[in-house]
Each structure stands twice: as structure tokens, then as C-alpha cells.
Amino acid sequence: MKTPFGKAAAGQRSRTGAGHGSVSVTMIKRKAAHKKHRSRPTSQPRGNIVGCRIQHGWKDGDEPLTQWKGTVLDQVPVNPSLYLIKYDGFDCVYGLELHRDERVSSLEVLPNRVASSRISDTHLAEIMVGKAVEHIFETEEGSKNEWRGMVLAQAPVMNTWFYITYEKDPVLYMYQLLDDYKDGDLRILQDSNDSPLAEREPGEVIDSLVGKQVEYAKDDGSKRTGMVIHQVEAKPSVYFIKFDDDFHIYVYDLVKTS
């Protein structure tokens, strides 16, 4: 698992750090916005770039300028300046304000949008979403490690890929899981917690935390703030969070507190 933009040593995202599938966060009222990184002034509305291939430069502080190419997966409705991106050669999904973040330079929208592909097994795809799984990864030394996680959804735009997160690393990843399943590298678990979603009456509205500002207390006593940007349809208690100081998308089963 790799991380762009030099966030981890040697370009690798650690698969050994402890993570939490269920955390307690505090809903907060948003004060005057405080950005760790400066943003460009807003300009005239731009065309829709969801589904487009892009490339741009990236320079954070004194680090050297690097070049990145990827696919824009989504524009976040509760923060339209924020885009979800899958960069070539990297497994995480990233959240960036492409038109505002001053670390992004020379943004170019490449010709031709990403063409949709046919799912090889729609039945398996439907069964897989919302399920606990064991995902097998091969290390550079050739040994295999099993990672328990949850398949969250079929990814937008790149529709043969799936969103997934892991108990020990609660960040949003995406893989071609149907291929992994057929190769024996993905096993769907028979988990007692994977009960069908509760039936809802027609027109019933389920409370959502999407758009809420959150404050997360870390083990060292420090706090970080962010926004809930998405609710997982297959598991309504599970949400995507974009923290102000990070471009990863975090996935938590939220416990609402006052």
C-alpha cells in the first residue's frame, strides 16, 4: 500500500499501525475556518471534472516538486471544492481541493473521460458490498498477510473497483476485488454482525451526520477537526471523514456524542 506526496517513508503507507473501527467523535459548531495550508481565492465556476483524468504538480513546503496523474472519482456535495481522487499506482483514495490548494500546481484535465466497464459478476458484486472480508496481500519477501476489513461500495467512475477499509488501517482504499476473490485472495466472512439492513417504512428519513463538523481526540491528547463527507449506504452507521490536516479519507463507525 503506497502513499503519494511523501507522507510516509519510502512512499509506503504502513499496514501495521493500530486503527479503530469504532470511535467516539464530538460534533462541534464550526468557528472561523482555520486552514493549515493556504488556499487560492475562489474564482468562476469550472466545468465538471468528475470522471476525468488529471495530472498536476505537488509541492509541500521545502519538499521537491513531484508530478501526479490520476482519476477524479467524485465531487463532495457538502464541500464542492473537495474532490476524491485515485492516483495511478496508489491504493488509497485521496481528498483534495484541487482548484484551491496552493500545493497543487499546473492542474491539467486530460482529454477523454474514463470509459465505464462491464462488471464480470454482478451477483457477486452485490453480495460482496457491506460484508466483512479477509484480504490477502503478498509482501516483498513473498509471504502472505491477511487483513480483515469491510467492502463499502462499488467505486464511482472506475466501476470494476470497490471501496474497502481495514480494521487496522481505517483509511479508504480501492481494489479490483472481484479479481482478488476469483484468485483466492479475498474471502467473504460469515459474520454475525453482517445482518441485513433494518427495514424502513416508505419515506422514512434516517438521521445522517453528513456535513457535520467533528473533533477527534487522539491518544496523545491532541485533537484534530474535520468534516463527515459521506454515509455508507450498505452500513449507515459507517461514514467517511476528511480531516483538515490530512488528505486521506478516514472510515469510521461513528458513535455520536454531545
UniProtKB/Swiss-Prot annotation:
GO MF, one annotated term: histone H3K4me3 reader activity
UniProt GO cellular component terms: cytosol; nucleoplasm
GO biological process: gamete generation; regulation of DNA-templated transcription
InterPro entries xrefs: SPIN/Ssty (IPR003671), SPIN/Ssty_sf (IPR042567)
Region entry Tudor-like domain 3, spans: 210-255
SS bond list: none
Subunit structure, as described in the record: Interacts with C11orf84/SPINDOC.
Region span, Tudor-like domain 1: 50-99
Chain residue ranges for the region called Disordered: 1-23
Gene name tied to this protein: SPIN3
UniProt-recorded name of the protein: Spindlin-3
Residues at the site labelled Histone H3K4me3 and H3R8me2a binding: D169, Q176, D180
Source species, domain of life: Eukaryota
Region (Tudor-like domain 2): 129-178
Region described as Histone H3K4me3 and H3R8me2a binding: spans on this chain: 138, 246-248
Origin species: Homo sapiens (Human)
Lineage: Eukaryota, Metazoa, Chordata, Craniata, Vertebrata
Protein family according to the UniProt entry: Belongs to the SPIN/STSY family.
Function of the molecule: Exhibits H3K4me3-binding activity.
